[in-house]
């Protein structure tokens, strides 16, 4: 998934909504596995910007600094092995996720729109 799955995404609606789908699907599967007392464990990774070729291909720029793919992968594996379900690497991304939860959606949408518009 992505941190984008936790908030509305004006000007990148398809991307944000696809990440929200992955997040909700993972939450549903986790509950099904728990109810069946399965030994199968899953996690959902919600990084912010990751330093990959995605930026060039999608033609986007990120306001936050990106983490290396190596850092994100190591962080994800370490936290998965600790039994964490929702894995969010980086302090600033954790803050953004928290703020998006306590802020009304219409305000989050306005902020996201402004951030996306600035990237053009």
Regions found by a protein language model. Give the residues of each.
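Active-site-adjacent segment of SDR/Rossmann-fold oxidoreductases
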Residues: 7, 28-40
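A transmembrane-helix-recognition feature enriched in membrane-embedded lipid enzymes
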Residues: 83-118
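Active-site helix of classical SDR
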Residues: 18
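C-terminal helical subdomain
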Residues: 44, 61-97
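Extended, polar beta-sheet/loop recognition surfaces of beta-rich domains
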Residues: 38-49
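Residue(s) in the substrate-gating loop at a strand-loop-helix junction
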Residues: 2
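Short, flexible catalytic-loop segment of classical short-chain dehydrogenase/reductase
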Residues: 47-57, 62
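Active-site loop immediately N-terminal to the catalytic Tyr-X3-Lys motif
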Residues: 9-13
């Amino acid at each position: 998934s992505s941190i984008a799955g936790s908030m509305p995404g004006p000007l990148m609606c398809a991307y944000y909504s696809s990440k929200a789908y992955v997040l909700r699907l993972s939450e549903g599967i986790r509950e099904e596995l728990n109810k069946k007392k399965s030994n199968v464990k899953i996690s959902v990774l919600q990084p912010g910007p990751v330093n990959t070729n995605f930026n060039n291909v999608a033609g986007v720029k990120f306001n936050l600094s990106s983490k290396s793919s190596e850092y994100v992968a190591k962080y994800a594996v370490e936290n998965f092995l600790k039994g964490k379900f929702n894995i969010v690497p980086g302090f600033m991304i954790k803050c953004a996720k928290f703020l998006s939860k306590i802020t009304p959606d219409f305000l989050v949408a306005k902020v996201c729109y402004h951030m996306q518009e600035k990237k053009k």
